Amino acid sequence: MLPSQTPAQGSGRFLLLSPPSLSSHPEKLNAILGLHARESTDLQMLDRLALGLVSLPQSTYDVVLLLTGADNTLAETYRLVSRGVLQGVVNSLKPGGKLRNRDNQIWGSGSDSAAGLGSSDGGGGGGGGEKKSSSEQAFRNEAILAGLVFDDRGELAKPDFGAQQAVPLKLGRKKNLGDSAFGNGTVELPASNGVRVTAGATTTTPTTTTTTTINSSTPSGVRFIDFSDDFGVPMVEETQELDEELIDEEELLGEFDMGRPIVQPPECRPKAGKRRRACKDCTCGLSQKLEAEDRAKRANADKALETLKLGTNDLAEVDFTVQGKVGSCGNCALGDAFRCDGCPYIGLPAFKPGEEVRLLNNDVQL
């Protein structure tokens, strides 16, 4: 019997996922739809799900069936069911819903002879003695990662976590002193000269153990630490501050040390054609030397800029005496209609290229 001729098993709401190749064979698709009740069965195309054109409702279906393609294999189905599509299919299943890889057949039943995608294992989806195809095994792994589990029948099912109930933890009541961890309220200690220690008095008896009665006001399970027993050494208060003498590191250096030249390491010495950068924690003087050079260069640059500054009474002359010499845009001599926005000749009449034009204190002289 072909997979499309397998009768439907169980009841509930079904979702049929069809590969696009099956739509070109309407007789096969209609035969599959005829095996299920139309009012409780939905049909979706896998390629539309993969492209995100349609979405599946949440927690709606009891059984999702992956239909075989036109060649009666699951090769096309496995190729279209990506991780995102499979996660959407799992979300559309109700708790306890089933995912079956053929037309209402459980995992491991039937065969895919055309593509070699799986073989009968006799025991369902848990894996049998015969070798499964890599595509089917990869699909099973993705299904498990998506949240499905194999039930006792070998079917991929969505676990029902709603049946679980929270169990409160009841803490026991306070035990009486007689039922505490100390038993009858005494602790057996090694004997010391046959002395039994009790709550009221100390008596000498020929016993070999010492019994100490626990104070009845002490809660069960509470231990006390005696900090006073330090073998005669007094305890130091935490608030007591130790006097620490601060040492100025500059006082450790004398005049001879301050006048001693700094020995520059060989790796820090400048090399020809390359300026070495100073270390972050430089102590050889290279950092100070480079900073001094930078300051000198900066001062020289500022001094050079000062000499180039022009005052308001200085003459700013643009010489066009060279025949054919024009501005960078080439339109300065053509008039305002052809001049740039920041052209110094805006407002001036057109002049011939080569004509001397002088701007002197905002007075135009041609």
Curated annotation (Swiss-Prot):
Belongs to the anamorsin family. Residues 100-136 are annotated as: Disordered. It comes from the Eukaryota. Residues 108-118 have a biased composition (Low complexity). InterPro entries: Anamorsin, CIAPIN1, Dre2_N. One of its GO terms (biological process) is iron-sulfur cluster assembly. It comes from Paracoccidioides lutzii (strain ATCC MYA-826 / Pb01) (Paracoccidioides brasiliensis). One of its GO terms (cellular component) is mitochondrial intermembrane space. Pfam families: CIAPIN1, DRE2_N. [2Fe-2S] cluster binds at C268, C279, C282, C284. A motif (Cx2C motif 2) lies at residues 340-343. Component of the cytosolic iron-sulfur (Fe-S) protein assembly (CIA) machinery required for the maturation of extramitochondrial Fe-S proteins. Part of an electron transfer chain functioning in an early step of cytosolic Fe-S biogenesis, facilitating the de novo assembly of a [4Fe-4S] cluster on the scaffold complex CFD1-NBP35. Electrons are transferred to DRE2 from NADPH via the FAD- and FMN-containing protein TAH18. It is found in: Cytoplasm; Mitochondrion intermembrane space. Residues 119-128 have a biased composition (Gly residues). Residues 268-284 are annotated as: Fe-S binding site A. One of its GO terms (molecular function) is electron transfer activity. Keywords: 2Fe-2S, 4Fe-4S, Cytoplasm, Iron, Iron-sulfur, Metal-binding, Mitochondrion. HAMAP family: Anamorsin (MF_03115). Its cofactor is [2Fe-2S] cluster; [4Fe-4S] cluster. Residues 168-258 are annotated as: Linker. This is Fe-S cluster assembly protein DRE2. Monomer. Interacts with TAH18. Interacts with MIA40.
